[in-house]
Every structure is written in structure tokens, then in C-alpha cells.
Swiss-Prot record:
Domain of life: Eukaryota
GO MF terms held by the record: cytochrome-c oxidase activity
Gene Ontology, cellular component aspect: mitochondrial inner membrane; respiratory chain complex IV
GO biological process, one term: mitochondrial electron transport, cytochrome c to oxygen
Annotated transmembrane regions: 39-59, 83-103, 120-140, 163-183, 201-221, 240-260
UniProt xrefs under Pfam families: COX3
Species this chain originates from: Drosophila yakuba
Protein name per UniProt: Cytochrome c oxidase subunit 3
Gene behind this protein: mt:CoIII
Catalytic activity: 4 Fe(II)-[cytochrome c] + O2 + 8 H(+)(in) = 4 Fe(III)-[cytochrome c] + 2 H2O + 4 H(+)(out)
Localization of this protein: Mitochondrion inner membrane
Keyword field contains Cytoplasm: no
Function summary: Component of the cytochrome c oxidase, the last enzyme in the mitochondrial electron transport chain which drives oxidative phosphorylation. The respiratory chain contains 3 multisubunit complexes succinate dehydrogenase (complex II, CII), ubiquinol-cytochrome c oxidoreductase (cytochrome b-c1 complex, complex III, CIII) and cytochrome c oxidase (complex IV, CIV), that cooperate to transfer electrons derived from NADH and succinate to molecular oxygen, creating an electrochemical gradient over the inner membrane that drives transmembrane transport and the ATP synthase.
């Protein structure tokens, strides 16, 4: 690697993963647009495969740099922390756009929607059934990931394992319930602006839950291989930050779109 012990800066070798990641993202988005317009889904699936393979190999390299090569010095870790903070901030603004679209349409419904919200003919979800259960699941997962973090800080290996395991399990449970809700939904993404804003907001949140669950599963596997210590575990810390962000976004989704907007 390019980084040596005589300076703290984060210099890495040339890597193909930013390029393949950009290609994967472009292919995924292009394929999704074509899929939404009744074209074949194959381009979307190809983009997903490229992105998943890129993420796997990129994270593998980062784990090797930090765990086996000692490249994640204190100064490097500070840079990684700021990078994660700015990434989460960008994600906040990403979801603000969906809430903006929702409130723009719901606070003053157009005459084409029957001047009502939800629009005429739309049967919305009961917020006190599956959505409320999903809220409880995500709040519980926030507790378990915090339990795992505190256990790691106390060098309690078994309780860290249990906390991470239950968090991953709750994330999978949430995803299954969300998929069931979509399957049983009485409206589609094409059913007015209500369907569009509902599925875009909850769908992208669901994607973030899948990413967060994968992130935490990787942390669980790394923990089982003794990659973390109480003084060196930023990979886990970043996953916990991301998971708490997903929790908070869901609370806003539940209160605004499911409860107030339904």
C-alpha cells in the first residue's frame, strides 16, 4: 500500500472499485427507469449484481487495510468519521426531497385528486397494524445495536455477538413485513401522486434497511473473527450510526405518511 507509518495520512493504492461502482449505479438507475416503463428488468438486475460485487470487494479491501495492515491510524479514523457524518447528512437531504414532495401534494390536494388526501379511490394502510409493528421492531433494533456497542466498549464478546445478532434478525423481520405489506397493498406506485410518494419514500427506506442489515451482518462476522476491539471498531460504529439514522427516518415516515397522511 501507499501509506507508510512515517505519516498519518490516508493514501491508498489505485483501485477499480470507484469506477465499477459508478458503472453499477448508472446501470441500476437506468434499468430501474426502463423497468418502470414496462421494459425488461434484466438491466436493473445486472446493475444490482455489479453494485453488490463492487461493494463486497471494496469493503473487503477497507477491512484488510484497517485490520491487517494497520493503515487506519487515529488521523485516518477522524477522516473516516467525518466522511460518514457527511454521507448521513447527504442521506438526510435525500429523504427531505421525498417528504417535500409528500407535503407539497398533501397539504393542498389538486382538484384532479378530488381535493382530498388520500385521493379519492385510494384505500390507505391502517397505521396501527403492520406499520406500528414495524415501528416497534425498528425501535427495538435501535436498543439492541446500542446494547452491542456498549458491550463492545466493555470488551464483552458474547453480549456484543448477541446484540448484533438480534439487530440483524430484527432488520430481516422488518424487511419481510414490509414486503408482505407491499404484496397486499390495495394501490400501486402508478396510483396518483399518493402511490408515487408512498412507494418512493417507503421503498427507498426499505433499501436503506437492507443496506444497514447487510452492514451489521458484516460487522457481526468481523466481530466473530475478532476484528474489533474497544479502542478500534469504527466499522461497527459507522454501522450503528447508519442504523440509528434509518430508525429516525422511519419514525418520520410513520408519523407523516402512514398516520397523518393516511
Amino acid at each position: 500500500m501507499s501509506t507508510h507509518s512515517n505519516h498519518p495520512f490516508h493514501l491508498v493504492d489505485y483501485s477499480p472499485w470507484p469506477l465499477t461502482g459508478a458503472i453499477g449505479a448508472m446501470t441500476t438507475v437506468s434499468g430501474m427507469v426502463k423497468w418502470f416503463h414496462q421494459y425488461d428488468i434484466s438491466l436493473f438486475l445486472l446493475g444490482n449484481i455489479i453494485t453488490i460485487l463492487t461493494v463486497y470487494q471494496w469493503w473487503r479491501d477497507v477491512s484488510r487495510e484497517g485490520t491487517y495492515q494497520g493503515l487506519h491510524t487515529y488521523a485516518v479514523t477522524i477522516g473516516l468519521r467525518w466522511g460518514m457524518i457527511l454521507f448521513i447528512l447527504s442521506e438526510v437531504l435525500f429523504f427531505v426531497s421525498f417528504f417535500w414532495a409528500f407535503f407539497h401534494s398533501s397539504l393542498s390536494p389538486a382538484i384532479e385528486l378530488g381535493a382530498s388526501w388520500p385521493p379519492m379511490g385510494i384505500i390507505s394502510f391502517n397505521p396501527f397494524q403492520i406499520p406500528l409493528l414495524n415501528t416497534a421492531i425498528l425501535l427495538a433494533s435501535g436498543v439492541t445495536v446500542t446494547w452491542a456497542h456498549h458491550s463492545l466498549m466493555e470488551s464483552n464478546h458474547s453480549q456484543t455477538t448477541q446484540g448484533l445478532f438480534f439487530t440483524v434478525l430484527l432488520g430481516i423481520y422488518f424487511t419481510i413485513l414490509q414486503a408482505y405489506e407491499y404484496i397486499e397493498a390495495p394501490f400501486t406506485i402508478a396510483d396518483s401522486v399518493y402511490g408515487s410518494t408512498f412507494y418512493m419514500a417507503t421503498g427507498f427506506h426499505g433499501v436503506h434497511v437492507l443496506i444497514g442489515t447487510t452492514f451489521l451482518l458484516v460487522c457481526l462476522l468481523r466481530h466473530l473473527n475478532n476484528h474489533f476491539s474497544k479502542n478500534h471498531h469504527f466499522g461497527f460504529e459507522a454501522a450503528a450510526w447508519y442504523w440509528h439514522f434509518v430508525d429516525v427516518v422511519w419514525l418520520f415516515l410513520y408519523i407523516t405518511i402512514y398516520w397523518w397522511g393516511g
